[in-house]
Amino acid sequence: MFISTRKFAAVRAFGGTFRSKSTNEFGRHLFKGAVAAPYLEWRGLSRNTLDTVDWTRDPVMTDKVAGAVLDWARDNGASVYCHWFQPLGAAGVRHGQSAQVQNRMFEFDKDGNQIWEFKGKNLLQGETDGSSYPTGGLRKTHTAGGYLGIDPTSPIFLRDDTVFIPSFLVSYHGYALDEKTPLLRSVDAISVHGSRLLKKLGYDVKGLTCNIGLEQEFFLVPRDPYNTRMDLQLTGRTVMGADAPRGQEMCDHYMSPPSVSGAPYSCMKEIQEQCFKMGIPLKTRHREVAPGQYEFAPLFGFVTTQIDQNLMVMQIMDEVAPKHGLTCLVAEKPFNNVNGSGKHNNWSISTTDGVNLFNVNQLAAKSGSREIFPVIMASVIKAVDEYGDLMRMSIATPGNDFRLGACEAPPAIMSVYLGDSMTHYMESYMHGSIEPYDPSTKVLNMGHTLPSIVIPNEDRNRTSPFPYGGHRFEFRAVGSAQNTSLVNTVLNTIVANSFKEFADKIEAGASPREVTQDALKKHWRVVFNGDGYDPACQEELTKRGLWRIDSCVDAINTYVSPKNTALFEAMGVFAPDECAARRNVQLQHYVGTVEMELKCMLDMINQHVLPSMRDANVGYVTELEEAVATLRRVWDDVHHTEDLGEKAAKARSLRLETMVEARCICDSAEKVCPAHLWSIATYKDLLFIDQTLS
C-alpha cells in the first residue's frame, strides 16, 4: 500500500526547518554575540563592546559589563563566579590542569537579606595563593601572592551554577605563574614584528593574530574493569598488561561506524551537547586507529579561546563518561602495543581582519602582491631549523616518551613537510626563478558511473611533525593530555623572531627577495617530504644536523640554553628566571609521574600479581621478587639525587628500562595464569568496549 509523504513534509519541510536540541542551544551559555547583546544594551553598552579590550580600562564600562554578566547569570540560574586559569605544568594526570577560585555573586546584610552584587572590580581581578601551585621557585610560602586578571580575548562562559571568567595568573613581581600569560605575550610579539615586516613589504595591517584547531584523541573504557586498575586510576597509564589476542591487526577500527545503541555513542553525543551550550563547536567525531579510541575535532578559532575550550572539553569528557558506565583516558600512551593519543595543533597566522598569511591567493588578493607569501613561508622554515629544540621541548611530556617515533606519531626530529608543489615553488624561488604558485585543486576522473573527485593540491604526510596542509601548519607531535599553550607560545615566538630579523635586514637596505633567498639557502635542510617512520630517513635527517632530541628530559633542559633564554627575553615572552622556573616545573612533573607509576607498579605486584602467581603456581615468583628489589634500589638512588636534571634523567632510565623489565615478567605471568585467579582487568576487558558492554 502506498503511503503519502505529504503529511511528513508539511511537518518537517525538506531543506531542514528541523533543528536538533543541541544546535538550537549552541552558545546559549557563552557571553558573546547575540547572547550578550541584550544584556549589554540594557546597560547602555554597544553589542560590540566586548570585541576589543578597551572596556577593561574604563571603570564605568567595566561596572556595566559586570552588571550585564550578573543579569545573564541570574537568568540562567547561576550564582557563583570564578577566575579560571591555567597553572604551570598544565599537562599530565589531571587533564589540562586548569584551576579556579569560586565565589558567590551575592552577600547578606545584617538582617540576613540576600543582596546581589557583582562589580567591575570582581570581574577584572581576583587573588589566590601563588605558592601552592607549581612555580619552579618563583613563589615561596612567605612570598605567596598570586594575582588573577581577566583575559578579555577569551569569552566568559557558564556551566551549571558557575560563571567562568578566563584569567591569567602572575606573581607580586609580575612573573607569569601560568600557561596563558606567555601565550598572550607571544601573540603580541608576532603581531608587532609581523606587522612591521608586512609594512616593509608594502602591506599595511592593523595587527596579526594566531588561529588554531585542536584535534583531541582519547580512549573510552568500561568503568568496572577500570576500577580494578590502580595504575589507570592514579596515573592514566597501564604499567603492566599483556597484549589482547586482538589489536590493530585488521586495521578495522579507524572510522568504523559507532554502535548507535552503545555507550560510547551516547557518551560522545552528550559531550557534544554540553560543549555546544558553551559555544564549543565540536564538528567532527569518529573512531580512531586503536580499539576503544576516538577523536573530537572543532572548528578553527583564536588561539587563546581554542585552548580554553579544549581544556573544558577534556573536563567535560572526564565528567560525562562515568554517567555512561565509561572512563575517558586522555593520556598519550595508556596501553602498550596499540596506538597512543595525540592532539594535532593546526596553526595559522592571519591579519586582524581575517587574511590568512598562509593562503597564497587570499594574501595576494588583499595585499596586491605575490612577493609576500614566500617571505612568510621562509620565516617559518627558518624558525623550525633554528629553534626545533624549543618545538621539541614544548611537547616534552612524560607520555610522549612512549609515543614519538613509534610509527603512530612523528619522530622526535623536527622537520617541515611542504609537499611537492610548494617545495618546487620555494626551491625555484630560492634559486632566483620566480614562478607563480597556484595551489589549485586537482580533479580525479572516476569514469562514467562515479562522480569526479576534487582533491587538494598537496598530499598528506602523517609522518612529519610539522607539515604544511594548505593555509596552515599542523604540529602533529603534540601529546593528547597537553595544555597546548606552551606549544603555541613557542610557535608564535620563534616565527616572530624570524619576522623581526627579516624586517631588520630589509630596513638595513637588503631587498626582501635577497633576504628570503638567503634564509632559504641557509635553512633548506629542514624541509623533508619523505617517510619520517623510515629508519634510513631518520638517519639522513640526523646527518643533516636537524634537531633530534629523543629524551623528553633532554628536551626540557633546552628551556635554559643561552640562545633560547635570549630569544624569549628579546621577544618579551619569558624573562630568564621564568625560563628556569618552567624548566624546573617540567622536570619535577616528569619525576613525579615516574614516582607515581613506580608506586602503582609495586603495589599491584605485591597486592595482585604475586598472590595470583603463587595461587596458580605458574612460576616467575623468584624473578619478580628480584625485579621488585631492583626497582626499590634504583628508585632509592633517584630519590636521593640532589640535582634535578640528573634526577629526572635517572627517573627516565628507571621508567624505560628497569620498570619495563619488571613489566615483562608480570605480562608473562598474566598469559599463563588462570583467568579466575587474575584479579586485574586485562587489555581484552578494557579495550573492546562494544563486546564488554553489549
Language-model-detected regions and their locations in the chain:
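N-terminal mitochondrial targeting presequence
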Residues: 1-21
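Histidine/acidic residue-rich metal-binding segments in metalloenzymes
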Residues: 18-119, 125-140
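Residue-level "edge-of-site" marker
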Residues: 62-63, 86-87, 121, 287-288, ...
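Hydrophobic/aromatic-rich, well-ordered segments within soluble, folded domains that form packed cores
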Residues: 78, 82-84, 307-323, 349, ...
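Hydrophobic alpha-helix feature that most strongly marks membrane-spanning transmembrane helices
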Residues: 86, 110, 322, 352, ...
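Short linear, low-complexity motifs centered on an aromatic residue
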Residues: 90-117, 123-125, 130-131, 136, ...
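Glycine-rich, acidic/polar active-site loops that bind/position phosphate-bearing ligands
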Residues: 142-330, 335-584
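C-terminal amphipathic alpha-helical interaction region
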Residues: 524-694
